Amino acid sequence: MFARISTIITTLFFAMLAAATAVPRTDPPPATGSQCTAVGGDVNCCNSVQDASNPIVGLLAGLLGIVLGPIQGLVGLTCNPISVIGGGNSCSSQTVCCTGNNFSGGLLVIGCSPINIDL
């Protein structure tokens, strides 16, 4: 009886150990400003970046009379375009590359992804 319980406990221990083993992430690194413009995107400084499925995004789109449809990914809120080339630009919020539509002067921008840029 003790051998059976010992075997079960040992098996469970190794199963939990295997489940807790760290696996490296395979996410691609964020794009840079030059990669953004190469794909036809615009570099923006957004006060907030939300998942498209966030109810706040749907509420804001509804208030603006925008029909977004089934979109996925990130949506920038209250965004201002910034130039990759030249000085004087700064972004104290989230720097993103947006390849989708820009609504209401940057209040809502779809198709955004975070980028690394030194401003």
Curated annotation (Swiss-Prot):
SMART domains: HYDRO (SM00075)
InterPro entries: Hydrophobin, Hydrophobin_CS
Protein keywords: Cell wall, Disulfide bond, Secreted, Signal
Intrachain disulfide bonds: C36-C97, C45-C91, C46-C79, C98-C112
Signal peptide span: 1-22
Subunit structure: Self-assembles to form functional amyloid fibrils called rodlets. Self-assembly into fibrillar rodlets occurs spontaneously at hydrophobic:hydrophilic interfaces and the rodlets further associate laterally to form amphipathic monolayers.
Family to which the UniProt record says this protein belongs: Belongs to the fungal hydrophobin family.
Protein name from the UniProt record: Class I hydrophobin 2
